[in-house]
């Protein structure tokens, strides 16, 4: 089961109450974790998934924000992705530091090698300080409109 938007985690919980899905697919990145409602909804859905042995697949790990007006859209994504190798590494390491999480790769073949390198060289989870600095430097923003 998949979805997009700030209500997707809450909607997945409602769906899991009615149907026995094998996996859920939800956006998860540093910005999502600190959204006013999404982070808590995501964690509640993850807890239900763990209780019911449902796999958690994450998407949008490399989402930087919406494409700026007039920006050259040089990637095959509907949002502006992270491009800097260090930023990609931080984003991938942060998501994969969660036990049992799957990270579905970004849909752009030019960014995929950096994602694979980051996943191959997995180390400890970046600290909150490192991730806050990363988020500020990268200019992370909502890809789902107003947050």
Protein language model regions, located:
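Beta/alpha (TIM)-barrel catalytic core signal, keyed to glycine-rich beta->alpha loops juxtaposed to Asp/Glu
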Residues: 1-147
């Amino acid at each position: 089961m998949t979805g997009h938007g700030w209500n997707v985690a809450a909607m997945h919980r409602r769906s899991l109450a009615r149907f026995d899905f094998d996996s859920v697919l939800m956006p998860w990145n540093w910005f999502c974790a600190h959204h006013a409602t999404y982070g808590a909804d995501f964690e509640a859905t993850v807890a239900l998934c763990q209780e019911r042995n449902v796999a958690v697949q994450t998407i949008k790990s490399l989402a930087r924000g919406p494409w700026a007006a007039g920006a050259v859209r040089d990637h095959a994504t509907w949002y502006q992705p992270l491009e800097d190798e260090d930023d990609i590494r931080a984003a991938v390491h942060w998501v994969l530091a969660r036990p049992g999480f799957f990270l579905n790769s970004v849909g752009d073949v030019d960014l995929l090698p950096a994602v694979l390198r980051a996943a191959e060289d997995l180390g400890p989870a970046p600290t909150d300080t490192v991730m806050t600095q990363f988020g500020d430097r990268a200019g992370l923003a909502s890809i789902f409109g107003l947050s």
